[in-house]
A protein has these predicted regions:
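Long, contiguous, secondary-structure-rich segments that constitute the structural scaffold
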Residues: 6, 62-199
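Long, low-complexity segments enriched in small/aliphatic residues
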Residues: 1-64
């Protein structure tokens, strides 16, 4: 199949023509370079998931759900955990090639380390780590906020757990932009690689 309309367009980053036929385009930097060519490597592929008890970021404010699952963790295959000497409940920092500090930097003087508890399972493929979305907040009532000179105290239960989007790769040339899928243009959520450091 050939699509003339697509074949007549160019990649906005590289200036190269887009293929007008079905093909696989690997995830790449904005300059069209393979991730490995820019040093974007690691030990584990990082993916995200949702759990039925906390399916959205806003569910952290639901104390009935917090009673069921008060904290998420860094989910890892048992074979990988054994190889690294990790067990359930151990704390690890998650780092990547574009976030070697393993922190969320809010650019206001506040940083939050990406440290979470290990959850060992057989439900994740070896070489992959994942985490349930909806945890690791710094807002949504998790931190103190000053309103009209009065401090509204945050609830530390809302800050529990870990959120790892900041470990996902940023484009090595654009710096402050996530890697983008060269076809769909969305952020690349499943191609970052990370390392786990026991703390």
């Amino acid at each position: 199949m050939y699509q003339e309309k697509t074949a007549g367009t160019k990649n906005a980053f590289t200036g190269k023509p887009n293929p007008g036929y079905a093909t696989y385009l690997p995830i790449q930097s904005s300059l069209g370079r393979p991730l490995e060519a820019d040093g974007l490597t690691g030990d584990f592929k990082l993916i995200t998931q949702r759990d039925i008890s906390h399916c959205k970021s806003r569910t952290i404010v639901d104390y009935w759900l917090l009673a069921i699952e008060p904290e998420n963790g860094v989910i890892i295959n048992k074979g990988d955990a054994d190889r690294l000497g990790l067990k359930d409940g151990d704390r690890v920092k998650v780092v990547s090639a574009t976030n070697p500090e393993g922190v969320w930097d809010f650019k206001n003087g506040v940083k939050k380390p990406m440290i979470g508890r290990v959850q060992v399972t057989q439900t994740v493929k070896p070489g992959v780590v994942t985490f349930n979305l909806g945890f690791g907040h710094w807002a949504t009532g998790a931190s103190d906020v000053t309103i009209d000179g009065k401090v509204v105290k945050g609830d530390p239960r809302r800050a529990a757990g870990i959120h790892l989007n900041a470990a996902m790769y940023t484009d090595p040339y654009l710096k402050n932009t996530p890697l983008q899928d060269p076809v769909g243009g969305s952020a690349v959520f499943y191609d970052s690689k990370v390392r786990l450091m026991k703390v």
